[in-house]
């Protein structure tokens, strides 16, 4: 999966099309990601007296990874991601549009 936790992504289809957000969690087995403030659902939660209050809680639900694209930090456009090796032999992700390295490490 070419999407990592902390990436800025844009939704390309569905009810949240055009929204951008940070990836909070990646679920590789299901090929899904959880994106900040995207695909919000309401869950009814029972109260547990010592831990939490009950009520209706709104939170993010997983979305298929194929429905989001990584946003390049350099050119600020959604882009496909490629891999290349640096001079010191480290494998990094790069933007296919502008050629800049996406990984911050």
From Swiss-Prot:
Ranges that cross the membrane: none
GO molecular function: rRNA binding; structural constituent of ribosome
Keywords, comma-separated and alphabetical: Ribonucleoprotein, Ribosomal protein, RNA-binding, rRNA-binding
GO biological process: translation
Any single Gene Ontology cellular-component annotation: ribosome
Pfam families: KOW, ribosomal_L24
InterPro entries, sorted: KOW, Rib_uL2_dom2, Ribosomal_uL24, Ribosomal_uL24_CS, Ribosomal_uL24_KOW, Translation_prot_SH3-like_sf
Family: Belongs to the universal ribosomal protein uL24 family.
Protein purpose: One of two assembly initiator proteins, it binds directly to the 5'-end of the 23S rRNA, where it nucleates assembly of the 50S subunit.
Subunit composition and interactions: Part of the 50S ribosomal subunit.
Protein name: Large ribosomal subunit protein uL24
